[in-house]
Curated annotation (Swiss-Prot):
Composition-biased stretches (Low complexity): 38-55
Key words, A-Z: Cytoplasm, Cytoskeleton, Repeat, TPR repeat
A GO cellular component entry from the record: cytosol
Organism in which the protein naturally occurs: Arabidopsis thaliana
Alphabetical list of Pfam families matching this protein: TPR_12
Positions of region (Disordered): 1-77, 582-609
Protein name: Protein KINESIN LIGHT CHAIN-RELATED 1
Assembly and interaction partners: Interacts with IQD1.
First and last residues of every TPR repeat: 140-173, 183-216, 225-258, 267-301, 307-340, 349-382, 392-425, 433-466, 474-507, 516-549
Family: Belongs to the kinesin light chain family.
Broad class of where this protein is predominantly found: cytoplasm
InterPro entries reported in the protein's UniProt record: TPR-like_helical_dom_sf (IPR011990), TPR_rpt (IPR019734)
Compartments where found: Cytoplasm, Cytoskeleton; Cytoplasm
Length: 609
């Protein structure tokens, strides 16, 4: 992988349904909820504050927080009435259904939750447990409703504490109603954490929900299959494809046992399996799953779905360099989309982007640019119903094509437009961080190192806030370190390389090319800082890895060997150590600076060699 790699994403269907936050009924559901094929963030919610306590008789005020309302409710004696909680919960649902707004619903839900807590406290034994369910399950449902309203307001951080409380309330050992409440709470908490970009915590919640569901229903129930697929999709988003594949296989087995041959459920499973196989580079198996899914959709008369699968088949053919077959698949899908959705629909634009990429790869740059322009015309004047995620995704893919044809300024404009579309959308911080990282790469390649560092820094800040510890985060840290090197911020670069090393060693291992690249950069930085022994230690480690595990055929081996020999020689006469240009340490082929400029620049930055 190059020193400054771009970002890689898994191709998913462009017409997947958005995730909607629904307020649960007051009665527990008899079955776990069925989930969509793919989760996407919901539309932008209102960010207004909740209304104050209704018992005061005051008008709504956007300045009163939910915590204030909760404090007011604590001493209200009417909350001890066991009939008040269900009544307030009904008012909350009615407020949303009637269009009064989520602020009134939030006020009712907070008071309902307080009432249920009072009633539960009066029941022995205390929570968790309690009689046969009653107030305990009502409290759990009220907390679910409260969290859902917070989510509808876009206040996802405030939705987490009620859900964390909700999963502690029911006792799954007390029967299916408690199990369902616990399952629903874990799944809702997982969705909320996902919207906050906390993917690892989200997956942990889904896993716990699946465990509870299996204990209650058995491991072959069709509803367990739906949850397995939901969790597999989350693993795909986290780029943990082996775990995703294992769960998807289990889902496929369950659906094949309970459904007719070539069912729609099986087709959905195979489409997900194709995404996983494609991401792992197993294109032949991906193609097989897509063909079987297409046959099932054809048998069910799902013309638009067949066209979506044709696009995925085209993607596989392009990966296999079977370009004529890819063009045929794309054109077939394009004909269906134009006829069924209209010539200005975003799905049409998405096929234009695929064709643009294909013609770029085959060297037909004029045709590629023409398809890019056709797609941009659609994205610039979107039809009603087009989501900003669809537009941002399309612009991002087009920017990659412009970047590859050496038009970085146009590519940057498209990425900036994508960021602007997503910046106010909940749950998009990780996606924005990815865009900023790509912008940093482009700024770096055109020599705008200060802009590159700022872009990487913004991306790193967002990824840290989301608790990111993936290999991608390590790569971004390495890229930011390289930008700091170009700005002569040596200490900062060293810290970034050290952090990147720790993450990549954990996620990829010491023999991965990205990890080896960080080792090399860190050794060069230590050399520039005068930490010769540290630089020698790292280079000796790299050479040992190459000699014992990776082989010495790599062209970097000889360069690293020469660098180590020089460092060992210099370590023997450290008093006469000659300061080097950091640019030469990172890039041995770089031209040395003039003596007079070097003599002025290094002392002013305080470097000690």
């Amino acid at each position: 992988m190059p020193a400054m790699p771009g970002l890689v994403s898994v191709k998913t269907p462009s017409d997947t349904p958005p995730l909607r936050v629904a307020v649960p009924d007051t009665q527990p559901l008899s079955n776990p909820p069925r989930t969509p094929m793919k989760k996407t963030p919901s539309s932008t919610p209102s960010r207004s504050k909740p209304s104050p306590n209704r018992s005061t008789g005051k008008k709504d005020s956007p300045t009163v927080s939910s915590s204030t309302a909760a404090v007011i409710d604590v001493d209200d004696p009417s909350l001890d009435n066991p009939d008040l909680g269900p009544f307030l919960l009904k008012l909350a649902r009615d407020a949303i259904a009637s269009g009064e707004g989520p602020n009134k619903a939030l006020d009712y839900a907070i008071r309902a939750t307080k009432s249920f807590e009072r009633c539960c406290a009066a029941v022995a034994p205390p929570i968790p447990g309690g009689s046969d369910g009653g107030p305990v399950l009502d409290l759990a449902m009220s907390l679910h409703v409260l969290a859902a309203i917070y989510c509808s307001l876009g206040r996802f951080d405030e939705a987490v504490p009620p859900l964390e409380r909700a999963i502690q309330v029911p006792d799954p050992t007390r029967g299916p109603d408690h199990s369902l409440a616990a399952f629903s709470g874990h799944m809702q908490l997982g969705d909320t954490l996902s919207m906050l970009g906390q993917i690892d915590r989200s997956i942990a919640c889904y896993e716990e929900g699946l465990k509870i569901q299996i204990q209650t229903l058995g491991d072959t129930d069709p509803r367990v299959g739906e949850t397995c697929r939901y969790l597999a999709e989350a693993y795909v988003q986290a780029m943990q494809f082996n775990k995703a594949e294992e769960l998807c296989k289990k889902t496929l087995e369950i659906h094949r046992a309970h459904s007719e041959p070539a069912s729609l459920e099986e087709a959905a499973d195979r489409r997900l399996m194709a995404i996983i196989c494609e991401a792992k580079g197993d294109y032949e198996n991906a193609l097989e799953h897509l063909v079987l899914a297409s046959m099932a959709m054809i048998a069910s008369g799902q013309e638009s779905e067949v066209a979506s699968i044709d696009v995925s088949i085209g993607n596989i053919y392009m990966s296999l360099c079977r370009f004529d077959e890819a063009v045929f698949s794309y054109q077939k899908a394009l004909t269906v989309f134009k006829a069924s959705k209209g010539e200005t629909h975003p799905t049409v634009a998405s096929v234009f982007v695929r064709l643009a990429e294909l013609y770029h790869r085959t060297g037909k740059l004029r045709e590629s640019k023409s398809y890019c322009e056709n797609a941009l015309r659609i994205y610039n004047k979107p039809v009603p119903g087009t989501t900003v995620e669809e537009i941002a995704g399309g612009l991002t893919e087009i920017s990659a094509i412009y970047e590859s044809v050496d038009e970085p300024e146009e590519a940057l404009k498209l990425l900036q437009k994508s960021m602007k579309l997503l910046e106010d959308k909940p749950g998009q911080q990780s996606a924005i961080a990815g865009l900023e990282a790509r912008m940093g790469v482009m700024y770096y390649t055109v020599g705008r190192y200060e802009d590159a560092r700022n872009a990487f820094e913004s991306a790193v800040t967002k990824l840290r806030a989301a608790g990111e510890k993936s290999a991608f985060f390590g790569v971004v840290l390495n890229q930011m370190g390289l930008a700091c090197v170009q700005l002569f911020k040596i200490d900062e670069a060293g810290e970034l390389f050290e952090e990147a090393r720790g993450i990549l060693e954990q996620e990829r291992g010491p023999c991965d090319q990205d990890t080896l690249g960080v080792y090399s950069n860190l050794a060069a930085t230590y050399d520039a800082m005068g930490r010769i022994e540290d630089a020698i230690e790292i280079l000796e480690q790299v050479l040992k890895l190459r000699e014992e595990k990776l082989g010495t055929a790599n062209p970097d081996f000889e360069d690293e060997k020469k660098r180590l020999a020089e460092l060992l020689k210099e370590a023997g006469r450290s008093r006469n150590y000659k300061a080097k240009s950091l640019q030469n340490l990172i890039d041995p082929n770089a031209r040395p600076p003039k003596k007079e400029s070097s003599a002025k620049k290094w002392p002013s930055l305080g470097f000690k060699f």
